[in-house]
Amino acid sequence: MILDDLVAATCQNMLARQAQKSLHDLQKEAAHITVSREFPFEKSLAQQKISVVAEIKQASPSKGQIVPSSEFDYQGIAKDYEVAGVDAISVLTEENYFKGSLDILKTVAADSATPVLRKDFTIDPYMIYEAKVAGSQIILLIVAILTDEQLKEYLSLANELGLSVIVEAHNEEEILRAVKANARIIGVNNRNLKDFTVDFDNTKRLRQLVPPEILFISESGIKDRSDVVTLEQIGVDGILVGETFMKAADKLAAIQQLRGEK
């Protein structure tokens, strides 16, 4: 199963990083960083207009190499996103399958005033502290790879550190688990992480299970303005878009097109 492979690779890479820097050392670094309770990303999601999370990634398990490594100007991409006024920038940090890194996250976070999401397969508190130290304001928790106890523990830790959390679900059971864990933001991934097929109706089907006070994001498979209009009509607060923007030669125009601004 692809998801199992991703989790295994994530664990192996995390253990290698832990050998270089202990959890205790990370915690000491995090303790020197100011904790804000502003949660700007959540405020953006709560506004009337649909929010846009624009992703930076050069590869994925489903598409392979999206952008040639020689053309992967992640700093330039982040600047384009910021100029376009996106509500958050998602940075892949998974190394093996998405060819991301914490260094990319650190650079983007340091250069940008826009909230940054660490997009990874968070499986341990170590990775949450890493995200904080790297400058991230948002993390991702995937229900499918965590127990109920882990979900609650990691949500609590993230809140202590001033991090917003997108809790990602793919089916009815996972939505209910996210709600039970008191998630403030739930994201529905239209891409099945087990076989990477896209089912855009997933958001439509699962939206009704999420209480209105919980912010709701649709992730993956969003290609054009008509998709966004459909999502707006069913009460989606935000969209996460990766491949569509990464493949666009003019990223500002692509973002404006999805927003209906041109």
Swiss-Prot record:
BP terms from Gene Ontology: L-tryptophan biosynthetic process
EC number: 4.1.1.48
Database matches in PROSITE patterns: IGPS (PS00614)
Name by which UniProt lists this protein: Indole-3-glycerol phosphate synthase
Pathway: Amino-acid biosynthesis; L-tryptophan biosynthesis; L-tryptophan from chorismate: step 4/5
Superkingdom of source: Bacteria
A Pfam family assignment: IGPS
Enzyme class label: lyase
Gene designation per UniProt: trpC
A GO MF label: indole-3-glycerol-phosphate synthase activity
Keyword entries, A-Z: Amino-acid biosynthesis, Aromatic amino acid biosynthesis, Decarboxylase, Lyase, Tryptophan biosynthesis
SUPFAM superfamilies: Ribulose-phoshate binding barrel (SSF51366)
Keyword check for Lyase: yes
HAMAP family registered for this protein in UniProt: IGPS_B
Catalytic activity: 1-(2-carboxyphenylamino)-1-deoxy-D-ribulose 5-phosphate + H(+) = (1S,2R)-1-C-(indol-3-yl)glycerol 3-phosphate + CO2 + H2O
